[in-house]
């Protein structure tokens, strides 16, 4: 009789533990069902880079004075500045400028220290290629402006993920009461563009 009661007690404990483990596992599953997905259907959807995103470098040939400051501040001496000295004007004449993005670490030093602001960071990050030599951009390739994510007709800019409230790290934790929920990036831009602080106050209040 004692062994029988022990078996029943053991069976009840095992059944209780099995139910508890099953509940713990399903609770995680059901908790994620009510969250918005964090994945992106790339390349049909793209994340909107942040304002200070360090993407491909844009170069303006007409502004460059061939001072080579970008080469000196670069940790790996990457930019190649090809220039000749004009004996008549006694000034440098720029012939070619190139950056190999297969080696670039996108630190932004060249952009920060450029005296003429001929270098700037863009939001372009799609630099994949089949040949690594194609990553060596000359002054012509560097001068091309990338297509803005919010204005590219071939893709759908991702909603909401780029406009998380302050203190929220995960995209699915954005409050449902937030004013920006369900709006496209250009609509958010239009909302925040007015000079009055009324809209900005509403957004800040919704984040609290």
Swiss-Prot record:
Binds 2 [4Fe-4S] clusters per subunit. Its cofactor is [4Fe-4S] cluster. The keyword Signal does not apply. [4Fe-4S] cluster 1 binds at residues 64, 67, 70, 114. Its EC number is 7.1.1.-. GO terms for cellular component: plasma membrane-derived thylakoid membrane. InterPro entries: 4Fe4S_Fe-S-bd, 4Fe4S_Fe_S_CS, NADH_quinone_OxRdtase_chainI, NDHI. It catalyses: a plastoquinone + NADH + (n+1) H(+)(in) = a plastoquinol + NAD(+) + n H(+)(out); a plastoquinone + NADPH + (n+1) H(+)(in) = a plastoquinol + NADP(+) + n H(+)(out). It comes from the Bacteria. One of its GO terms (molecular function) is quinone binding. It is a peripheral membrane protein. Its main location: membrane. [4Fe-4S] cluster 2 binds at residues 74, 104, 107, 110. HAMAP family: NDH1_NuoI. NDH-1 is composed of at least 11 different subunits. This is NAD(P)H-quinone oxidoreductase subunit I. It comes from Prochlorococcus marinus (strain MIT 9312).
């Amino acid at each position: 009789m004692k062994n029988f009661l022990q078996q029943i007690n053991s069976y009840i404990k095992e059944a209780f533990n099995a139910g508890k483990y099953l509940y713990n596992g399903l609770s995680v599953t059901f908790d994620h069902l009510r969250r918005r997905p964090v994945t992106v259907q790339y390349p049909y959807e793209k994340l909107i880079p942040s304002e200070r995103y360090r993407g491909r470098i844009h170069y303006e040939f007409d502004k460059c004075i061939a001072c080579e400051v970008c080469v000196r501040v670069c940790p790996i001496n990457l930019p190649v500045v090809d220039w000749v000295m004009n004996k008549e004007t006694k000034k440098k004449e720029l012939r070619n400028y190139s950056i190999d993005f297969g080696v670039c670490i996108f630190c932004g030093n060249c952009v920060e220290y450029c005296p003429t602001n001929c270098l700037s960071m863009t939001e372009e990050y799609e630099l994949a290629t089949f040949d690594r030599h194609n990553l060596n951009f000359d002054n012509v390739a560097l001068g091309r402006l990338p297509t803005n994510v919010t204005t590219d007709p071939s893709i759908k800019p991702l909603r909401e993920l780029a406009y998380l409230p302050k203190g929220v790290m995960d995209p699915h934790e954005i409050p449902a009461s937030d004013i920006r929920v369900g709006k496209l990036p250009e609509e958010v831009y239009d909302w925040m563009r007015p000079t009055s602080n009324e809209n900005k106050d509403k957004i800040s209040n919704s984040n609290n």
